[in-house]
């Protein structure tokens, strides 16, 4: 019973309806034109459909976070988040004991795969200030072989990953940032996959071995090659051999899915920002930015029943001249809306 549809403060007037239960089919208030040659005029248009009973509430794609009374603080359970202490055991022990874990701001060093239970929720509030990180050449993620995830979801669970950055470094050749196999009701939100030549940290000072040679332009593309890392990348075109040497940053597989919102996956060290394969679970992407890869920003293989909204790819001139924005194979029932694919103006070759 809401008879007043809208109330206008400036005019102290309102738009109302006589119906007790109704659906608004059209509402417009302000300067309007009936067609391209009509004179504009201020008016209010309201079209309501009376109903006999309230409709069934729509199912939300975006779940609410658990109440804070259920949260446990990861620091209180022994994790340091100082980017020096190996926090793997403290984090895994917390996951094994508790469902909802608050991860305070800090950089948490990890040396083995973290595995979520079916009910695990990991909650941070800043995907750069709060990171799970690999040190360079971490043994469990190095050498040759099958992909090894820094963080692995449960299979078919209701996992949540919120507000946490994932950093697999530059020289961890088997690394995957997140392997996601959780179910339709799972949720990943506000996650940054760290790496490449973009970042928010203060650049490290150059060592004497990395100083410019006589006649070399400071800051130019012809700078001396350096050992790369996400905190101090080689920015010159073609000079960073660490690019494109890892597996995918975000891997959705094994019938995994859910809702993915506000994801920034731009690690140049990964082969793809997103790889989805072998899943028919109905899933949604809301606002994902994929940038700065060498071979492809996103790849879909044997995927069905996905809605991909506000998907943005970007190829950079330094590493992305040969990069494809999206590769698809064996896919069905995939919806793209508000898709935005672009290459920076500095790229001098077409797709």
Regions found by a protein language model. Give the residues of each.
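Beta-strand cores of modular interaction/reader domains in eukaryotic scaffold and signaling proteins
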Residues: 102-104, 121-123, 133, 284, ...
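Short, T/G/N/S-enriched strand-turn elements that build extracellular solenoid repeat scaffolds
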Residues: 91-95, 106-118, 122, 151, ...
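All-beta strand scaffolds that present successive hydrophobic residues in beta-strands
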Residues: 1, 122-125, 160-161, 186-189, ...
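Surface-exposed beta-loop-beta
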Residues: 262, 267-273, 287
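Glycine-centered loop/turn positions within well-structured domains
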Residues: 130, 296, 306
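Extracellular "leader-to-stem" segments immediately downstream of a signal peptide or signal-anchor
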Residues: 1-100, 127-162, 166-170, 174-177, ...
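Beta-rich catalytic cores
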Residues: 246, 270, 294
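Short linear interaction motifs
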Residues: 169-171, 280, 285-291
């Amino acid at each position: 019973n809401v008879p007043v549809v809208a109330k206008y403060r400036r005019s102290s007037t309102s738009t109302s309806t006589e119906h007790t239960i109704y659906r608004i089919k059209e509402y417009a208030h302000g300067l309007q034109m009936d067609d391209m040659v009509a004179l504009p005029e201020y008016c209010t248009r309201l079209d309501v459909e009376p109903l006999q009973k309230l409709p069934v509430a729509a199912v939300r794609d975006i779940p609410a976070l658990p109440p804070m009374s259920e949260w446990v603080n990861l620091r209180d359970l022994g994790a340091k988040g100082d980017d020096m202490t190996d926090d793997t055991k403290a984090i895994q022990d917390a996951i094994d004991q508790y469902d909802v874990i608050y991860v305070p701001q800090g950089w948490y060093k990890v040396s083995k795969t973290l595995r979520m239970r079916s009910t695990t929720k990991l909650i941070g509030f800043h995907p750069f200030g709060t990171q799970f990180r690999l040190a360079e050449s971490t043994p469990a993620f190095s050498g040759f072989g099958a992909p090894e995830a820094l963080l692995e979801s449960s299979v078919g669970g209701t996992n949540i990953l919120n507000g946490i950055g994932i950093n697999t470094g530059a020289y961890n050749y088997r690394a995957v940032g997140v392997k996601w196999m959780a179910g339709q009701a799972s949720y990943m939100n506000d996650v940054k996959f760290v790496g490449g030549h973009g970042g928010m940290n203060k650049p490290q000072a150059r060592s004497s071995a990395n100083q410019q040679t006589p006649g070399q332009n400071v800051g130019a593309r012809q700078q001396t090659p350096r050992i790369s890392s996400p905190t101090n990348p080689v920015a010159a075109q073609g000079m960073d051999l660490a690019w494109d040497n890892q597996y995918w940053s975000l891997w959705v597989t094994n019938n995994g899915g859910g809702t993915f919102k506000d994801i920034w996956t731009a690690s140049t060290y990964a082969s793809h920002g997103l790889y989805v394969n072998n899943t028919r679970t109905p899933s949604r992407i809301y606002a994902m930015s994929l940038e700065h890869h060498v071979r492809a920003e996103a790849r879909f293989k044997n995927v069905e029943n996905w809605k991909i909204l506000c998907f943005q790819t970007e190829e950079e001139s330094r590493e992305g001249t040969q990069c494809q924005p999206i590769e698809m194979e064996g896919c069905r029932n995939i919806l793209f809306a508000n898709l935005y694919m672009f290459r920076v103006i500095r790229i001098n070759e077409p797709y």
